[in-house]
Amino acid sequence: MKALRMSRAAGVCAALAIAAASMALATGLRAQDVMPPGGYKGVDPAEHEREKLIDLSRAHVARVKYGGGGDWYGDPSALPNLQREFEKRTGIPAANSEIVIELGDPGLFAHPFLYMTGHGTVKLTRDEIEKLRAHLVAGGFLWADDCYGMDASFRSMVKELFPERELVLIPLEHGIYRSFYTLEGPPKIHEHDGRPPQGWGVMDGERLMIFYTYESDVGDGLEDADVHNDAAGKREQAIRMGVNIFYYALTRE
């Protein structure tokens, strides 16, 4: 199994490089087009100019900056930690820093794996809805992690995004729970109201386009250990779920 995964990892690396080159040629993207507004979070452009250039051959998760008053920036250490663990565990090169993208950015399609989180309202403009829909229909993937409080507005957003599709409960035998680790569904990192953790999604035929972790708080579990003081076992559960989602987003296996 390990040899098979390493073989797949090599294939993913090659596919990422080819896809990056194809994307740049097909869209005419320049480095300044791909760079999200404000650059990499936490990087001083004057001192780290080279860090502005996203290496499209490296796997990464792009955080979506959205309107509506919700804290789209929640769990700030989660994605850098996930990318670091993903590279360490799978052998697939991943970005070092968090990438923030707005849905109206011309470089949106350079980021096949998008991430949303928050405690409050998610509100997209009509233009953002259309661009996100086009991104997902073209093969993109969105992981939304409810940090407790965004459920109603996120479900409303999904209805606006895909009025012809349903947000459905993803069965435990789905590939997203088997892609790298064998899991029994989303973990329960933090308790809020006694409800079980759930994974919801929007399908395009056999392809999962949107994965929504609800009552799970995966992002909290991915944060630096001293943020929530979660037990090591809880953090490991969150990392494994995150790695599985990341791996599935890249391979669809």
Model-derived features: where do they sit?
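An acidic, glycine-rich "communication" segment
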Residues: 36-41, 151-226, 234-243
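Surface-exposed patches in mature extracellular/periplasmic domains of secreted proteins
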Residues: 92-102, 144-147, 165-173
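Extracytoplasmic/secreted envelope proteins and their assembly/folding machinery
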Residues: 76-83, 129, 133, 151, ...
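Aromatic-Pro/Gly-enriched surface loop or interdomain linker
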Residues: 29-113, 119-120, 209, 217-253
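Solvent-exposed loop/turn segments at secondary-structure junctions
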Residues: 66-70, 119-123, 142, 147-152, ...
